């Protein structure tokens, strides 16, 4: 769809992008295990991007979303006719189909309290003509109560929050986090106001995604009945 002048849609490989940035020579890179950032890192500001596994769960709220598991697979051949990410509704949720330079990636998202894993695998592999599943990941949908913790630490990436990838909102959220961090660090706004701004953004993303489930799909199944029943307040 058309984008605003200041927006664009891109495909990129996160690992390769990270390698380009870290190898650019613009940054001093130190590889070490960090347990307590504020005690172990000498800097004015710390951006904590350690991911979802190091979180203090008392600082997080759950987001409303019907999904919690994804099966991953890949076809090791380029599809020249596929030039965009497909989002395909299935009886148990939906599947992303992403074109890569030399392959196509698949992700079958479902709720493991509604659909058994083997049932999901069988539907995934048969529906998309796949030979095998490469990985299975369970996830939570969540947001931090405060994006600034301690004296000088800003939560970023999955350390701040995560919501399922239906609208591919992660990069936009990370950019908004940077903007809010800047505003707080340089006293454009108070950190309390910045925190409220980024939480409002996350709630907007939650509601945008919930819109997709409100009217269901062509499938009359337990998953879609559950998804349609989720509390939803777009205001």
Give, region by region, the residue ranges found by the protein language model.
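A conserved beta-strand/loop capping segment in the N-terminal third of enzymes
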Residues: 1-14
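A short, glycine/Asx- and small/polar-enriched loop/turn
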Residues: 39-43, 148-151, 217-219
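A short acidic (Asp/Glu
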Residues: 57-59, 166, 203-207
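Active-site-proximal substrate-binding core of FAD-dependent oxidoreductases
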Residues: 182-227
């Amino acid at each position: 769809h058309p984008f605003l002048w200041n927006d664009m849609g891109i495909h990129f490989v996160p690992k390769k992008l990270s390698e380009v940035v870290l190898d650019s020579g613009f940054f001093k890179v130190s590889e070490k295990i960090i347990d307590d950032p504020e005690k172990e890192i000498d800097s004015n500001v710390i951006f904590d991007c350690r991911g979802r596994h190091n979180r203090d769960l008392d600082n997080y709220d759950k987001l409303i979303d019907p999904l919690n598991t994804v099966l991953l697979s890949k076809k090791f051949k380029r599809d020249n006719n596929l030039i965009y990410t497909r989002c395909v509704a299935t009886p148990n949720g939906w599947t992303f189909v992403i074109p890569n330079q030399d392959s196509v990636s698949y992700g079958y998202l479902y709720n493991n309290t509604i659909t058994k894993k083997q049932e999901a695998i069988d539907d995934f592999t048969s529906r998309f003509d796949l030979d095998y599943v490469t990985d299975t990941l369970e996830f939570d949908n969540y947001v931090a109560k405060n994006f600034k913790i301690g004296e000088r630490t800003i939560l970023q990436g999955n350390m701040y929050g995560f919501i399922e990838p239906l609208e591919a909102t992660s990069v936009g959220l990370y950019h908004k986090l940077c903007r809010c961090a800047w505003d707080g660090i340089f006293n454009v706004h108070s950190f309390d106001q910045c925190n409220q701004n980024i939480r409002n953004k996350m709630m907007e993303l939650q509601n945008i995604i919930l819109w997709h489930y409100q009217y269901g799909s062509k499938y009359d199944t337990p998953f879609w009945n559950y998804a349609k029943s989720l509390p939803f307040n777009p205001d």
